[in-house]
Amino acid sequence: MVTANSTVKVGNVTFSNSAPLALIAGPCQMETRDHAFEMAGHLKEMTDKLGIGLVYKSSFDKANRTSLKAARGIGLEKALEVFSDLKKEYGFPVLTDIHTEEQCAAVAPVVDVLQIPAFLCRQTDLLIAAARTGRVVNVKKGQFLAPWDMKNVLAKITESGNPNVLATERGVSFGYNTLVSDMRALPIMAGLGAPVIFDATHSVQQPGGQGGSTGGQREFVETLARAAVAVGVAGLFIETHEDPDNAPSDGPNMVPIDKMPALLEKLMAFDRIAKAL
């Protein structure tokens, strides 16, 4: 029986619940090539300066938008070209979400981490297909799922022969259009063996809260991120944008890119204290 690795390496970035904090960050969706390079350049510069490992993230297709008319991204083929060029230019690993088994084989030659969206975390065939690529798999815990039930989700990946899996907490449904973060979930999920990531931006979502789109409360991103880092996590997942209020998706919960350096500096200080105790 294969069990989850407690330390997962993605390129030059190490994820472990006892190692220094790592970061998964980028804009919600890949809008254009130029925008991807702009965001990547800012993130690379700040993380190099702060000494934090970076996995760059962006989605080629936002397949679960609230409205049929909402922008979804630039598509798989174009995104893979951009991801490949970003890796060559900046040297960091990259992450994107996949939604079907067929996408796994197409994405894996380029992308370092295949992410399973929260709504799809119980889809057995998708989990198996992602695991069999041999790439690191990051599973978002469903908003409907208890943290201890992630045991079965992780087992679908590890028992398919892939021990390199990350488990991400991104809030739990609390009535209509609202998520809350139960910090007990972090040590519970850590007890399952895999490195745990806290998604600080999707945790402040208000799903469908704007009628035709998702709302959010970005003013609470730092609050929740501080709490998670104080508890102890392997990494943080933070979506960022230069103009969140005009972003095509998830703007209300994304962090302005110019606010990221100060935020990360604070969070790294909390991380050092938490892991020294």
From Swiss-Prot:
GO biological process terms on file: keto-3-deoxy-D-manno-octulosonic acid biosynthetic process
Pfam family name, one: DAHP_synth_1
GO (cellular component) term, any one: cytoplasm
Entry keywords, A to Z: Cytoplasm, Lipopolysaccharide biosynthesis, Transferase
Alphabetized InterPro entries for the sequence: Aldolase_TIM, DAHP1/KDSA, KDO8P_synthase
Subcellular locations according to the entry: Cytoplasm
Gene Ontology terms, MF aspect: 3-deoxy-8-phosphooctulonate synthase activity
Reaction catalysed by this enzyme: D-arabinose 5-phosphate + phosphoenolpyruvate + H2O = 3-deoxy-alpha-D-manno-2-octulosonate-8-phosphate + phosphate
UniProt-listed Gene3D superfamilies: Aldolase class I
EC number(s) reported in the record: 2.5.1.55
This protein's record includes keyword Cytoplasm: yes
Pathway participation: Carbohydrate biosynthesis; 3-deoxy-D-manno-octulosonate biosynthesis; 3-deoxy-D-manno-octulosonate from D-ribulose 5-phosphate: step 2/3; Bacterial outer membrane biogenesis; lipopolysaccharide biosynthesis
PANTHER family linked to this entry: PHOSPHO-2-DEHYDRO-3-DEOXYHEPTONATE ALDOLASE
Family the UniProt entry places it in: Belongs to the KdsA family.
NCBIfam families: KDO8P_synth (TIGR01362), PRK05198.1 (NF003543)
Name of the protein in question: 2-dehydro-3-deoxyphosphooctonate aldolase
Organism lineage string: Bacteria, Pseudomonadati, Pseudomonadota, Alphaproteobacteria, Hyphomicrobiales
